[in-house]
Each structure stands twice: as C-alpha cells, then as structure tokens.
Amino acid sequence: LYSPLYSPYTYTSTTVRSYVDDFMRRAQSAGCVVYKGERADEDLSYLKEDTIWQKLKDRIYDSTITLVFISPNMREPYRKESDQWIPWEIAFSLRETTRSDRTSHSNALIFVVLPDRNGRYDYYSLMRHFTIVAGNIQNGYAEVVRWDDFIANIQRYIDKALWRKKCTPSYEVVKSV
C-alpha cells in the first residue's frame, strides 16, 4: 500500500481534508478538475442552515461529477439521515434542477473509500451506509473505489463515471434521502 498520506511504518493522523487537498493537487496538475467544494480555510459554521444549504446548492448546481470521500466517521450514528448534510448534498447533485433557461442534470457519482488511521479499508464493509449511497452502489450507478486505486488513476475513474452518467436512463438512480 502506498499513499503519500499513509506510511505502513508509522501512525499517521490524517483528515478527510488532507485527502481532498491531495486529490486537488493531483487533479489540477493533470488539468482534469475544477473544485467546487468547501475550501480548507472556509468556515460556514456562523451561518444559518438555510444559508449554508443555499451556498451548497449554488456550488452543486452546475457541477458534473460528485466525489464522495468515505471515511469511518462520515455518518453520525445517532442522528437521522435526513438530519445530516452528506445525503442531501448527494441527492441535490443527482436531481435535475432548472434555473431560468438552464437545466442541471444528474451528476456522475464516485465513492472513494479512504483508509482508516491504520491504513486499512475493511471498516467500509462493516459500516452502515446512507440509503442514497447504498442504493446507488447496488444499482451500479456509483462506483466504489479505494483511495490508493483512485489516486493512481484519477482520469480512468472519472471517465468511467461520466460514461455511466451518459447511460443514466439505464439505471434506477436513487435521488432522495
């Protein structure tokens, strides 16, 4: 296993943000991505939830691919799915939304499983997934890929996701929380 963020010889404390930053560096150097997510230095916590949601929707509206970085603690186990941000962000990215004369279509969808703090991925098969995540894995619309595989060939996984997006009518895409 090789990842610049994980060494098999030492315990490495990383965050989802560190993986996002690594992905962005690599993707931008390859010229294949424009990032529309939250910046590391961006704090929206002082805003009302409605304002945050509007900002997220504006960013998601004209995007093409939704990457979801799956980590051991991405789901808050004692909160209902409908009270968590991640399923709503995924749902909005999959819905067709019209503003003025422009319609945003379903995004391509990739789930990237991050290694845990010990560099392992086995937690993923044991975790309870959001319904929208599980549904789009089961129907084949979203691909699940380990971080080390994804980061080694970003363009391949993006191309595969875009191909599935073109074939959207062939899938029963789960679009609701």
Over which residues does each language-model region extend?
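Short C-terminal domain-edge/linker segments immediately following a structured domain
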Residues: T97-R102, Y141-V145
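Residue-level detector of short, conserved catalytic/binding motifs and their immediate flanks
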Residues: I65, I90-A91, N107
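Short beta-alpha junction loops
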Residues: P72-N73, T97, T103-R120
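C-terminal interaction surface of TIR/SEFIR-family domains
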Residues: L1-Y6, P115-V177
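Conserved N-terminal substructure of TIR/SEFIR domains
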Residues: L1-I65, S104, Y171-S176
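Conserved TIR/SEFIR loop-to-helix hotspot centered on a Trp-containing motif
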Residues: N73-R99
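Redox-cofactor binding/interface segments in oxidoreductases and associated redox assembly factors
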Residues: V68
